[in-house]
Design a protein with these regions (language model features):
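Non-catalytic signal-transmission and effector/linker regions of two-component phosphorelay proteins
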Residues: 1-5
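Cofactor-binding loop segments of dinucleotide-utilizing enzymes, especially the Rossmann-like FAD-
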Residues: 11, 82, 148
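Two-component/phosphorelay signaling modules centered on CheY-like receiver
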Residues: 12-33, 70
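CheY-like receiver
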Residues: 14, 25, 38-122
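Conserved RecA-like P-loop NTPase ATPase core
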Residues: 19, 87, 143
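Conserved binding/recognition cores within well-folded domains
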Residues: 113-153
Length: 153
């Protein structure tokens, strides 16, 4: 399975450390950058792409909303914020989930699972087979056995 590259951006060093700890417990995640420095993320994203960004909303230099406006077409976001009042605005972007601080591993894991389910769905190709005179769409991930019958599968 392909690793999901991600960035952790929060102006609180303890929040960055907590999220780094949580990401290390999920095998599919690879942290490309974890920082409190917004400009380091901007520089990184000008030359690199990541799948997922864990981002705080209220930061001193550039807000999380401004960051999402800048990089919305390239990445998905999981917002980690102490303030619920930005939730509605944030869904104008590619936000997978809005997780309120303090963040438990359970809440974090649910948000990541939501992204993983979404990314698997988006990359899964459909398989069409003829059954009972019509075309039926199948998800290849749901096929466990195939039986051959003469010249047919």
């Amino acid at each position: 399975m392909r690793k999901i590259s991600c960035i952790i951006l929060d102006d609180e060093p303890l929040a960055v450390a907590l999220l780094e700890n949580y990401t290390s417990k999920i095998a599919q995640l690879h942290v490309a950058l974890a920082t409190t420095d917004v400009f380091q993320v901007v520089d990184y994203l000008q030359n690199n792409k990541v799948d997922l960004i864990f981002i705080d909303i209220q930061m001193p230099e550039i807000s999380g909303i401004q960051m999402m406006e800048m990089f919305n077409k390239d990445s998905h976001f999981i917002i980690t914020s102490a303030y619920p009042n930005y939730a509605l605005k944030s869904y104008e972007f590619r936000v997978v989930d809005y997780v309120l601080k303090p963040i438990s591993f359970d809440k974090f894991h649910k948000a990541v699972t939501k992204f993983l389910d979404f990314s698997i769905e988006a990359t899964t190709t459909a398989l069409f087979v003829k059954a009972e005179g019509k075309q039926v769409r199948l998800n290849p991930n749901e096929i466990y056995f195939i039986e051959g019958l003469s010249d047919y599968i």
